[in-house]
């Protein structure tokens, strides 16, 4: 059967576009990573789940993916308008630790979360603090080409030099100029942004000697410099959250156009927010951190399941009822798959339908629904399992695994009693014991290897 064409929604073009890689069977993918001054929350993690699904989809289509992700451990100011203090310095003061300790701690916490959510590790992880010279060199080239100017607090990019600045976000640059109501200090235009910020009179924990003075790089320059180092000055796909469109990605594009004469990525993909009561979730609260969900009795993979029920370009409203429903559905799915026989074959008609769903801009709600269709179909049991596990290469739910739980002693005794009466041929009594176990909140699963017990969903 023919492979359906892979279509991706390109934010720059505002349309679905057939995906064609620069090099045959290889993809360069750059993902904006976390600013490691605090724990990631569920909204942050939704973006990385979307990136994981994208990577898995590319791989199942036969591509070798070079997935590069940055770690912002310096330079991201509290305000995207280049004002306020560095988030790392602020986090260090809050935790009474050094900025370096904060970065190391929260970077590890972030990767722990990725592991719990079964998110693939990037091919390359690059920290901003380990690429200062690359960023300085990038700024110097912009300076040589006349795209920068210096103020008393730093070196800025002159957005007026680019005729199509803001194309990605459809920014009304003239409207911004006319409607500006905030203090611009020495900036020439409201859209100009910092490339290098001076430390000033107060020494910082993170600062470097640059050609313009002691300071630190701006937030946007790190991604342009590191993407070019690891993927070249033009690569296939750049991804991030929808909040990156109007400022961060717009400014990345400006830097690369100014330096190289072209946009750095052929496709721009953006995941939409997770919302709580129709508002964007921020890092200010702790209730939607992954460890908080676990403390409430939810397993991390239930959150992964929940995100698959909504398209990545749709806002997902978070509710505890929704997460509970996702956990129950995940348990039912595992129980259905775990006790199906092995050594089956993937059904080709279902495979083609699944590929059609995922290849049309990662339509995971339809792909997830198809798993249930397969399990409720008339396929041979072993082929149901093989087909569902093929789907799980994209879903990433590890549906062949059943969580190990401690079974209470009185339940274990009932299971043992049921096994004995079955051996004696008293199947009516065995069924009665099964029902008793069911009423107590557990499920007996019989197979050729004996019986196992799981918590009833």
UniProtKB/Swiss-Prot annotation:
Q: Does the keyword Zinc apply?
A: yes
Instruction: Kindly state one GO CC term assigned in the UniProt record.
Output: cytosol
Q: What Enzyme Commission number(s) apply to this enzyme?
A: 6.1.1.16
Q: Which reaction does it catalyse?
A: tRNA(Cys) + L-cysteine + ATP = L-cysteinyl-tRNA(Cys) + AMP + diphosphate
Provide the cofactor note recorded for this chain's UniProt entry: Binds 1 zinc ion per subunit.
Principal location class = cytoplasm
Disulfide bridge map? none
Q: Name one GO biological process term.
A: cysteinyl-tRNA aminoacylation
GO MF annotations in UniProt: ATP binding; cysteine-tRNA ligase activity; zinc ion binding
Residues binding Zn(2+): 32, 223, 248, 252
**Required co-factor?**
Zn(2+)
For the keyword DNA-binding, the answer is no
What keywords would UniProt list here? Aminoacyl-tRNA synthetase, ATP-binding, Cytoplasm, Ligase, Metal-binding, Nucleotide-binding, Protein biosynthesis, Zinc
Q: Where in the cell is it found?
A: Cytoplasm
Instruction: Write out the residues that bind ATP.
Output: 283
NCBIfam families according to UniProt: cysS (TIGR00435)
User: What family does the entry list?
Assistant: Belongs to the class-I aminoacyl-tRNA synthetase family.
Q: Fetch the PANTHER family from UniProt.
A: CYSTEINE--TRNA LIGASE, CYTOPLASMIC (PTHR10890:SF3), CYSTEINYL-TRNA SYNTHETASE (PTHR10890)
* Assembly mode: Monomer.
Q: What is this protein called?
A: Putative cysteine--tRNA ligase 2
Q: Which organism is it from?
A: Photobacterium profundum (strain SS9)
């Amino acid at each position: 059967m023919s492979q359906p064409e892979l279509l991706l929604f390109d934010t720059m073009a505002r349309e679905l576009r057939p995906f064609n890689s620069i090099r045959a069977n290889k993809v360069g993918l750059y993902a904006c990573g976390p600013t490691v001054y605090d724990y990631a929350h569920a909204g942050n993690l939704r973006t990385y789940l979307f990136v994981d699904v994208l990577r898995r989809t590319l791989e199942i289509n036969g591509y070798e993916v070079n997935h590069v992700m940055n770690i912002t451990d310096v330079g991201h100011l509290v305000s995207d308008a280049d004002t306020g203090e560095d988030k790392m310095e602020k986090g260090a003061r809050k935790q009474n630790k050094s900025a370096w300790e904060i970065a190391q701690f929260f970077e590890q916490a972030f990767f722990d979360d990725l592991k719990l959510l079964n998110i693939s590790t990037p091919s390359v992880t690059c920290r901003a603090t380990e690429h200062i010279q690359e960023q300085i060199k990038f700024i110097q080239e912009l300076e040589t080409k006349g795209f920068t100017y210096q103020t008393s607090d730093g070196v800025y990019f002159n957005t007026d030099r680019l005729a199509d600045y803001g194309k990605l976000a459809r920014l009304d640059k003239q409207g911004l100029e006319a409607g500006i109501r905030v203090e611009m200090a020495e900036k020439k235009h409201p859209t100009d942004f910092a490339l290098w910020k001076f430390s000033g009179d107060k020494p910082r924990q993170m600062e470097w000697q640059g050609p313009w003075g002691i300071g630190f790089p701006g937030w946007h320059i790190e991604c342009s410099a590191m993407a070019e180092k690891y993927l070249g000055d033009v690569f296939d796909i750049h991804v991030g959250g929808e909040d990156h469109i109007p400022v961060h990605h717009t400014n990345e594009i400006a830097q690369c156009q100014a330096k190289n004469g072209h946009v750095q990525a052929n496709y721009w993909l953006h995941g939409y927010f997770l919302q709580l009561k129709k508002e964007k979730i921020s890092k200010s609260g702790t209730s939607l951190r992954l460890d908080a969900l676990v403390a409430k009795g939810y397993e991390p993979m239930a959150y992964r399941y929940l995100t698959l029920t909504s398209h990545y370009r749709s806002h997902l409203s978070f509710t505890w009822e929704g997460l509970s429903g996702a956990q129950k559905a995940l348990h039912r799915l595992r129980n259905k798959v775990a006790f199906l026989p092995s050594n089956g074959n993937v059904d080709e008609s279902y495979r083609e339908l699944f590929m059609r769903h995922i290849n049309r801009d990662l339509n995971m709600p339809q792909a997830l629904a198809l798993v249930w269709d397969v399990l409720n179909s008339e396929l041979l049991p072993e082929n149901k399992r093989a087909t569902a596990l093929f789907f799980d290469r994209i879903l990433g739910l590890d549906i062949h695994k059943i969580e190990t739980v401690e079974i209470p002693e009185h339940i274990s005794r009932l299971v043992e009693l049921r096994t004995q009466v079955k051996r004696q041929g008293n199947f009516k009594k065995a069924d009665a014991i099964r029902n008793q176990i069911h009423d107590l909140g557990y499920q007996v699963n019989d197979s050729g290897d004996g019986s196992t017990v799981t918590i009833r969903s």
